[in-house]
Amino acid sequence: MPLQTFLFEIGTEELPADFVRSAITQWQGLIPPGLAAEFLQPESVEIYGTPRRLAVLIKGLPECQPDRLEEIKGPPASAAFKDGQPTPAALGFAKKQGVNPEDFEIRSTPKGDFIFVNKQLQGQASRDLLPKLALSWLKALDGRRFMRWGDGDWRFPRPIRWLVCLLDDQVLPLQIDNGSTTLVGDRLSRGHRILHPADVSLEHGQNYLAQLKTAGVVVDPQERRAMIEQQITTQAATLEGEAIIYEDLLDEVEQLVEYPTAVLGKFDQEFLSLPREVTTTVMVTHQRYFPVVDKDGRLLPHFITIANGDPSKGDIIAAGNGRVIRARLADAKFFYQADCDDSLDSYLPQLETVTFQEELGTMRDKVDRIMEMAAAIADQLGVTEQQRGEIDSTAMLCKADLVTQMVYEFPELQGIMGEKYALVSGESAAVAQGIVEHYLPRHQDDDLPQGLPGQVVGMADRLDTLVSIFGLGLLPTGSSDPFALRRAANAVINVAWAASLEINLLELLTQGCRDFVTSHPDKTSPLQALKTFFLQRLQTLLQDEQGIDYDLVNAVLGNGETNCDEAQSRLHDRLLADLQDVKERAQYLQELRDNGHLDAIYPTVNRSAKLASKGTLPTDQLDPRPVIQAPQLVQDSEKAVYQALLAIYPKAVEVQESRDYETLVNALHELAPTVAEFFDGPDSVLVMAENDELRQNRLNLLGLIRNYALILGDFGAIVKGI
């Protein structure tokens, strides 16, 4: 069977760069399975996009679907036949499927006997299927800022201007009706708006990329990206320098041009006196230029921009872009000098004019709360007097730059300018660093704060936000988190883990919620909701970022079958009171599984815990003496277990303080043979004895084993064999 090539292109006005990237990704996930659902298996599916077009090029496509046998389920057999004759329901089903009742097969299913028919279906021609599929692919695209175009109801990010629908060299019928506008699929595409403004008559789908390149359009985003990188590198080399290629910027400009041309421009040397972050922000964020540095990494008074115009007009483009950036940098220099005329702390009163959030006061109010929370964290950490002073100053000044002229004009410089202005104002390097670092991490892969002031103040800032927003009842949902509360909670945990900060999160949340209710007497405490939220974040971070098996995470978090509600509540408080311990126990359990040592203690603990759940021993009871009646120990095997537990008890108490879980695991490992004799040896005992005192005594023995293991984790959550 000959193989065909199908081309579908949508031509538009200039699309937003982020939509082009998103549309390509959407089609990559949509079109191949969509073809497979129609029993079409091409050799390749290539998705392309530029600012003015989206296209799919399908190669090696069969002329038609394969013939196939389709099994169709009908009504229940009990409703299909009566006295051996087909009922109206059966006859209706047969008519609908174009078969005779004699063709029915009765088959058993989990829901009873049903009638089935097998139909031989002839494959449809690809040319008949593709126009409908193409239209469905277009309608399936989703994104922000869709608009109506023309006078119809069609919505798309920009008006659609042309359609190409080619199967090999033949145009397939495809039509979009949008009010008074009708677009019909054709072979006519369009070239580059400047380099080749005329139509391009496409001869064959296989010639698509080559013909458009001749017309000044590089359709393949990856090819454009490679061209941009190569041209940028070449231009920077003319200065004996190197371009700083930001991946986010490269992602964007790749979708802003159809035929990229790198243009080298320059600005006045005087602007290099500005903080580097200011200059690069103006270039990268506001102008989409690539900065250039010398061999020592020093910024040069040059930039590289990617033009979508005539390469021969490079000098004109460079001059125009140079004028624009000089004006922007001149403004930035004015803002910087004006801001430096006053000390950073002089901006604090102006924070009273900035609202943090309705019902939560001003940014100055938030700073006061951050200072209180930071002081509480500092108390927990037992910092030195010097460190406390640095933390206090960082907390007080961390938001002061928000009301400076520079940050008002360039909001992305918040924190960065706070650091610069702090140094100009005579603050210590530690305080300046803390101001910029308290925003870290800004996103999942961002750096973490390295200095103690930034770590403490960053956690305090996020905890205040979490308590305040939760207090207003604005909790994140599965699809919406407008205040980035998940990211804030993740940052608190990750900063504490990375810096080994021994904070008591439960205590901090309790204090924060208490203060919130005091200042908002009409609100209820969000403490329980916050505890649940942080436990969810712990589970996600341990599994997704630390790579801990899900069942071991559940064991550490106390989500096992052997844990009662009372024990879970107490354990959850323990988790939030010691974040470092949570991570250490999870990692240790994973290590035990990986080296095979977990299997040595799992049977003993798991069997004991399951039986212990039938008893009444509290999960925090560790001392055997008050709960085991020695005179009631009848058989040698249970006496041996009791003696072993007496030996483990002091170790268990010590492990709770030392977190030396290896000692506990070794003790449980040594206990295993004794417990095996208790259960299955010649002198085994019947745990669920008829005598109440004997039964309770034996259940308490097993409960103590469970309780010792709970110091490490709830073994009832562990899945054997993973």
Curated annotation (Swiss-Prot):
- MF GO annotations: arginine-tRNA ligase activity; ATP binding; glycine-tRNA ligase activity
Q: What are its E.C. numbers?
A: 6.1.1.14
Q: Where does this one sit in the cell?
A: Cytoplasm
Q: Which GO terms of the cellular component aspect does the record hold?
A: cytosol
Which of UniProt's keywords are assigned here? Aminoacyl-tRNA synthetase, ATP-binding, Cytoplasm, Ligase, Nucleotide-binding, Protein biosynthesis
Question: What domain of life does the UniProt record list for this protein's source?
Answer: Bacteria
Annotated catalysed reactions: tRNA(Gly) + glycine + ATP = glycyl-tRNA(Gly) + AMP + diphosphate
Query: A single GO BP annotation from the record?
Result: arginyl-tRNA aminoacylation
PANTHER family hit by this protein: GLYCINE--TRNA LIGASE, CHLOROPLASTIC_MITOCHONDRIAL 2, GLYCYL-TRNA SYNTHETASE
Subunit composition? Tetramer of two alpha and two beta subunits.
Q: Please give the family membership noted in the entry.
A: Belongs to the class-II aminoacyl-tRNA synthetase family.
Sorted alphabetically, which HAMAP family does this protein's record hold? Gly_tRNA_synth_beta (MF_00255)
Q: What is this protein called?
A: Glycine--tRNA ligase beta subunit
